[in-house]
């Protein structure tokens, strides 16, 4: 949320992304991947995986009102393919931003919409909505959380041997400062806070789509261990042989929203999502480390934790064709490397984030575990 507030100083929030447009080549696995554990591989994911850029007329409108917003507008200029098409091309980690809408219709008439804007009728239904920023950056390939989950479920059922898919969920409720509204002569729809009841809604909507046997939850990972942290440090993560065809969720938020989600659920017992908890705490299993240069990543990976990092941010790397951050992300050992550019945007540069040979996954370069040392690290895993 602090990053978003910095973004509001320019205009509004935080954003990234682009679309993949070419098929992913997947080779045959020449080794028994069933013995490999989930934390011993590395995959590429996408950030704001639902995103479609704002219409040109809306971008022009805000640039005219606030010329300083031009630079921020550039960070909104990306599009993602529908989730099922991303999965077809090898993406195994996505992120969905959700807004609470228990009555329905709160975001059905975006104030930045034009006469040509198409709004899904599902925006009038009660339930969580998926988009980036109310009234401005609201276009989405799956505007409701349930709709996104149904897309994931259909694809997973049709491809039951797929590697586990991690879905990051960010609960968004930041208020737009009044001074920003005045500067833009634009009144924003203020979001509903994510209290305990609204956080429970996330779990309820997930469980309404996915049966327990299709989920990797804190309970399944903890097993008989005293705490979730103890389980991942001693027993380890599930093997791929028992994890294929399954989905796991993690809460992107830290701070107050994370604490609200974990309160009353020691070691996340009964919860669906993992959280980025303090190292060593009972709930510690997954960590969000956006900065791939963060030296704590390799330390966390060596202790058995899952880590997600980012290869790029705010379109900077693609515009400058700078691969330093991407290369650091790959080398860090983080199991999930998130990008806005799983393929290059030729209008910007050749910058892209993919493994050699465009394989779907590879042995973790830091924590090899069950991956053999005598095979290339970029071998493909279906």
Predicted regions, residues:
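Bacterial N-terminal signal peptides
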Residues: 7-15
């Amino acid at each position: 949320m602090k990053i978003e507030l910095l973004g509001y100083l320019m205009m509004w929030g935080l954003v990234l992304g682009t679309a993949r447009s070419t098929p992913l080549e997947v080779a045959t696995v020449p080794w028994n991947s069933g013995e490999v554990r989930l934390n011993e591989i590395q995959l590429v994911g996408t950030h704001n995986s639902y995103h479609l850029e704002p219409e040109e007329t809306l971008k022009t409108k805000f640039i005219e009102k606030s010329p300083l917003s031009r630079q921020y507008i550039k960070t909104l200029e990306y599009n993602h393919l529908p989730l099922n098409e991303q999965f077809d091309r090898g993406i195994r980690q996505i992120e969905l931003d959700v807004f609470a809408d228990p009555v329905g219709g709160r975001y059905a008439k975006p104030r930045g919409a034009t006469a040509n804007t198409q709004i899904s009728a599902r925006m009038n239904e009660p339930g969580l909505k998926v988009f980036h920023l109310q009234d401005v950056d609201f276009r989405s390939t799956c505007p409701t959380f349930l709709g996104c989950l149904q897309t994931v479920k259909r694809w997973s059922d049709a491809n039951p041997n797929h590697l586990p898919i991690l879905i990051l969920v960010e609960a968004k409720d930041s208020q737009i400062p009044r001074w920003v509204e005045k500067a833009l002569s634009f009144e924003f729809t203020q979001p509903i806070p994510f209290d305990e009841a609204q956080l429970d809604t996330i779990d309820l909507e997930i469980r309404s789509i996915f049966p327990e046997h299709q989920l990797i939850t804190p309970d399944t990972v903890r097993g008989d261990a005293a705490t979730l942290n103890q389980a991942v440090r001693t027993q380890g993560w599930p093997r791929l042989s028992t994890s294929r065809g399954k989905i796991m969720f993690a809460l992107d938020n830290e701070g107050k929203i994370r604490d609200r989600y974990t309160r009353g659920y020691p070691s996340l017992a009964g919860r669906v999502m993992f959280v980025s908890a303090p190292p060593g705490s009972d709930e510690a299993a997954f960590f969000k480390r956006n900065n791939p240069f963060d030296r704590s990543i390799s330390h966390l990976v060596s202790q058995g934790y899952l880590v997600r990092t980012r290869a790029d941010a705010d379109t900077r790397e693609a515009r400058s064709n700078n691969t330093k951050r991407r290369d650091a992300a790959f080398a860090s050992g983080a199991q999930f490397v998130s990008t806005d550019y799983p393929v290059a945007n030729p209008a910007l540069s050749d910058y892209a984030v993919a493994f050699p040979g465009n394989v779907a996954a590879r042995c973790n370069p830091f924590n090899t575990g069950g991956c053999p040392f005598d095979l290339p690290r970029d071998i493909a895993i279906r």
